[in-house]
Amino acid sequence: MKLKIISIIALISISLSVNAQTQKSSDGNEAASKTLFELSPFERAVCCIRFYEGLHRKKDYPYVGYGHKLRPGERYSSNMTAREAEVLLRKDLRELCAMFRSYGQDSLLLAALAYNIGPYKVLGCKGRYPKSTVLKKLEA
């Protein structure tokens, strides 16, 4: 458990030095390059996940895009473009944020953690996984 906490702290400290990639506005013009702290928290999470997950390919099955684990019945291709992978990442992250909505400002933190290790390892699953230490501390 200590290793996980140290890993999370290292991830956060490393991500502070990562610059966000150039964003395109809706009219197609490139906006000026922004640093990570000039982005919204949700955009920061997307940038960090994209950076550390990388684009998964056929050899990474059952993971596609930026770490999306295929669910039964889903038909996403392992050859998806970076844009398609980002759309899927944003969709997954929004779903996880909604799952943790009751935790208020910490919902994005929990969503990013759940994207990495799975929501049931954060929430706990009777008989399989205990509730995560991070969640226990937030509830205290």
Regions found by a protein language model. Give the residues of each.
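Cell-wall polysaccharide-cleaving catalytic domain and substrate-binding groove, primarily
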Residues: 16-108, 112-140
